[in-house]
Swiss-Prot record:
This is Large ribosomal subunit protein uL13. Belongs to the universal ribosomal protein uL13 family. The keyword DNA-binding does not apply. Part of the 50S ribosomal subunit. It comes from the Bacteria. HAMAP family: Ribosomal_uL13. It comes from Corynebacterium diphtheriae (strain ATCC 700971 / NCTC 13129 / Biotype gravis). Keywords: Ribonucleoprotein, Ribosomal protein. GO terms for cellular component: cytosolic large ribosomal subunit.
């Protein structure tokens, strides 16, 4: 029997909603990246986009451990000389919480063309409302680790 190679048309995509309230940012990012890549599916192939759509709500209530809100810095550059802008993670979470969550999820993905295509299936919202109710998304539950 020959090896099964999935095609992009054979993949059925599901929609998941992740509530980011009091979830650690890195844990949220790894689970969302795995869903976007389709790592939990039996027909996963690293060269085919077989991931699901992920909706992250309540991005403004995500938990950042330790004192990273004051210590960690976010950088962006305008492209002009002297155009480096810096902002702490806490200030960035106040201004654009959805952008912080998107960047952390994008950082957990491989840095190639396929991941740039699968990141387009990520939808992040600061509040609890989202416009994708017609797709009937399932809620994604995090498994609790015994401490």
């Amino acid at each position: 029997m020959s090896t099964y190679h999935p095609k992009s048309g054979d993949i059925t995509r599901k929609w998941y909603v992740i509530d980011a309230t009091d979830v650690v940012l890195g844990r949220l990012a790894t689970h969302a990246a795995d869903l976007l890549r389709g790592k939990g599916k039996p027909q996963f192939a690293p060269n085919v986009d077989c991931g699901d759509h992920v909706i992250v709500i309540n991005a403004d209530k995500v938990h950042v451990s330790s004192n990273k809100r004051e210590r960690e810095m976010r950088y962006r550059h305008s492209g002009y000389p002297g155009g480096l802008k810096t902002m702490t993670l806490g200030r960035s979470l106040e201004v654009h919480p959805e952008r912080v969550v998107e960047e952390s999820i994008r950082g957990m993905m491989p840095h190639n063309r396929l991941s740039r295509a699968s990141v387009k299936k990520l939808h992040v919202f600061a509040g609890s409302e989202h416009p994708y109710a017609a797709q009937k998304p399932e809620t994604y539950e995090f498994k609790q680790v015994a401490q």
